[in-house]
Structures are given as structure tokens and as C-alpha cells.
Amino acid sequence: MTTFESNVNIDNEQKVADAIQNQVGNSIKVSESLDFDYYIDRVLFENDGIVAWIEIKCTDTYEYCMSSYYKISLKKIKRGIDWGESTSAPFYLAVNFKDGIFITRITKECMKNYPIGWGGRKVRRVKGDQEPMIAIPISEFVSLRNFTIDKVYY
């Protein structure tokens, strides 16, 4: 499998996954990294049921309040929402900023209010690093310390 993440990226993501695991408790488990085809990093599960999908991002450049928005690939967010809707489980974005881990739930409804533009990495590694981006208001994130999972069962 081709990977676009360095060992440092993988280690940082695992640290965030471990912090999420500590926050949600023992009955809910954080999965190992999902295959690249999912476009989303992890699921949270309880017994055999998926209770949430989660995308994890890490930045060592920005502090939480440095900008009004956190920008991320529109395709990645759409995929997370699609997985969430198809499994009746919420989709979350967790970002490890320089000053802490913050998390937000993203739905199709709230996404309609987010600005969409063009952006991405300034130094291209592969074709497609510049792409449609969605800007999620920082005000919608909460500190992981204050996070509780919205478990939805059908």
C-alpha cells in the first residue's frame, strides 16, 4: 500500500488516537488506522458496532486560535460524512494543534454553512495536493478534555 505519511506523522496520529481512547473510556475502542481507500483515519467502536468515524490531523505549525478557520480537503470531509450517514454514526474531525487536541462533529447540514475554496499544500508532493478545501470555524471545535461521544444506535 502506498502511504503519504511519514513515520513521524503516523506516530503523531497514534498519540492523538491514544488521547481519544483515554477520553472516551473503556467500553468504546479506537480502531487501528483504516486502509487508505476509506479516506478516513479511524473508527470508534463498541462491541462490534461502529459508533463514530474520525479523521485525525496534526499540525506543529498552528495554535488553536491562530486562525478563524481550520482548512481541510473537501473530499476527505465529504467521505467522512458519507461513511457516517451510511452507518448511522457521527463523523468527527480531531486536530492536534501546538497547544492541544480539539475536536468537532461535522454533518451535512452544518457543512452547508462552511466556506469552500481552493488550497492545499504549497509545495506539491503529488498531483492533487491543491484541491477544493472546506474551512471549518474554529469556534465549532471543543477541547478533547471536554469531548463526549454522541452515540447513536439504530
Explain the meaning of each model-derived region.
Residues 1-34:
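Acidic-basic catalytic patches of nuclease active cores, encompassing PD-(D/E)XK
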Residues 2-4, 18, 22, 45-48, ...:
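Non-catalytic C-terminal interaction segments of nucleic acid-processing enzymes
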Residues 26-48:
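Active-site metal-binding core of divalent-cation-utilizing nuclease and nuclease-like domains
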Residues 32-33, 56-57, 94-97:
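Short His-Asn-centered micro-motif
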Residues 37-39, 49-53, 86-88:
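Short connector loops at helix/strand junctions that flank enzyme active sites
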Residues 42-44, 49-63:
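Conserved catalytic cores of phosphodiester-cleaving nucleases, focusing on short active-site segments
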Residues 56-77:
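Short beta-strand-loop-alpha-helix junction that forms the active-site gateway
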Residues 82-94, 98:
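Mid-chain, well-packed structural core segment of small domains
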